[in-house]
Amino acid sequence: MLFINTDLQECLNALNLEFDEHKELVKLVKNNSFSGFASTVVFHLKGVNQKETAQQIAAWLLKHKKAHYRRVFVANNNFINFEISPQKYLDFLKTKPTFAPKPTKVLIEWVSANPTGELHLGHVRNAFFGHVLNNLMVFLGFQTVREYWVNDYGQQARVFGFSVYQALHLQQNIKVTPHPDGYEGELVDSIAKTITGIPLDKLSFEEFLQQPFLDQLLADCTAKVLEVIKQDLATIHIHFDSWKFESQVVKETDYKKLLTQFKDEAHYEKDGAIWLKTTLYGDDKDRVLVRQDNRPSYFGTDVAYHLDKAARGFDLLYDIWGSDHEGHIKRMHCVYEGLKIHQKCQLKITALQLVMLYKNKEIVRLSKRAGNVITIKQMLQMLSEDAARWFMLSQTNNSIIKIDLDTANLQNSSNPVYYVQYAYARMCSVLKVVDQAALAQVNDCSLLTHEKEIALLDQLVYFKSLLEKVQVSHELHLLTNYLYETATLFHSWYKACKINDPAQYNLTQQRLLLLQSLHHVFGQLLQILNITAPQQM
């Protein structure tokens, strides 16, 4: 937590002022009147004169926390503004930001694309997001497990298996009527060439589902596709600790026993199906758990999976889904509330919007079934992984990502990832000739008074608080925003101030100390984002 927040909470307690501890008390602001840390805390206090109370708080902080602040003052709008003392800035310059290990066990499940083809551009945003979230959680000290949920039981897996079955016929020049939602492409054909021992009887889809070879064929198809998916993920430096199979979870789930965990009025039978009365917990309608054919619904398998997650002793569960699953979020929270799991195991679900690729000023339509997709390998031929990561992580979760390849491939300051990497390379260039022993002896930063230096110091102060905020909000674009804003400040400072000035030794050493701290923070963030941190450019 930002030390100013801690100081404010102590102050409010001392002044007997009631406040909501969950409110964000302090923000880093940048406007024409003031740039730095400011608080609107008095706006959240009931029954007080805002101006007088703000002045009381400022006076208390200057008296009891004098070492932390050069100045605390109340603006005309009753914001409390903070100017941090050189002594406190020095603490941040001399201490590398780290986090102690936490006992919290976290399961992060992401990507989880159906095993029906290669991963494509539509999956990459999810892949990068989950990867960076995991990196962040590890950096913050959490114990994480990375999991991929293999949807090998549902209708899509069956249709894919049927498509492979039909490809077997086509390879023998036997005409068949394709499934209306069937899959095509090189992967389907290549898998079909590995399948042997299956009679070619031109079965309908319904007949296909009754065959004794069905389970083995679907398992073989899933295994082949997962080999490709794992290779795709390794190409973009993503690996998982656990691969959880839907078919296995369904096999191990006793749905009658599962129902006993809900109160009696929370489930019922209707039209031969078993329903969960999720409306009891705020859902807009009840949901089918087990269908008339005794197969669990998509919702039913997800319920079983999430109960399995909770049973494994995790304290915090993260689900990273696509926007097409957004309507599913509410009902999963309803299940956790109905079983009171949320009291011991917190569930957080993030739904990410689509990715759109522009080529020749037209949107490229993606369709895995038609075999006409932009695969990960093809994407990496069109833009670098660094650029792909940046552009897919730099917008809010509910924003549709629109990538213009010309912009993403620019090698100048118009390309934000290039701009940030160039800042890091500049820092490396300066630091490689610095006397580290002399720099370690610097115990003052009072000469850092340029407005750009104060702004950069504030960015350093804010860094740990930012990471904690992102861990709670899942808004990973705040990380790229921070890097870009700090890079902009750095480049302007580099241009405005002579960092290495032999005529001003003490000022030079203090500026080098600032630069070294920036270099460390940039390195940590680029590592979390898994974006290359170049030593030179």
From Swiss-Prot:
Alphabetized Pfam families for the sequence: DALR_1, tRNA-synt_1d
GO biological process: arginyl-tRNA aminoacylation
Subcellular location: Cytoplasm
InterPro entries, per database record: aa-tRNA-synth_I_CS, Arg-tRNA-ligase, ArgRS_core, DALR_anticod-bd, Rossmann-like_a/b/a_fold, tRNAsynth_Ia_anticodon-bd
EC number(s) recorded for this UniProt protein: 6.1.1.19
An MF annotation (GO) of this entry: ATP binding
GO cellular component: cytoplasm
Motif mapping: 'HIGH' region: 113-123
Annotated signal sequence range: none
Main location: cytoplasm
Keyword Aminoacyl-tRNA synthetase assigned: yes
Catalytic activity: tRNA(Arg) + L-arginine + ATP = L-arginyl-tRNA(Arg) + AMP + diphosphate
ATP-binding is among the record's keywords: yes
SMART domains tied to this protein: DALR_1
Enzyme class: ligase
PANTHER family linked to this entry: ARGININE--TRNA LIGASE, CYTOPLASMIC, ARGINYL-TRNA SYNTHETASE
Subunit structure, interactors included: Monomer.
Family of this protein: Belongs to the class-I aminoacyl-tRNA synthetase family.
Name the record gives this protein: Arginine--tRNA ligase
The organism of origin for this protein: Mycoplasma pneumoniae (strain ATCC 29342 / M129 / Subtype 1) (Mycoplasmoides pneumoniae)
Phylogenetic placement of the source organism: Bacteria, Bacillati, Mycoplasmatota, Mycoplasmoidales, Mycoplasmoidaceae
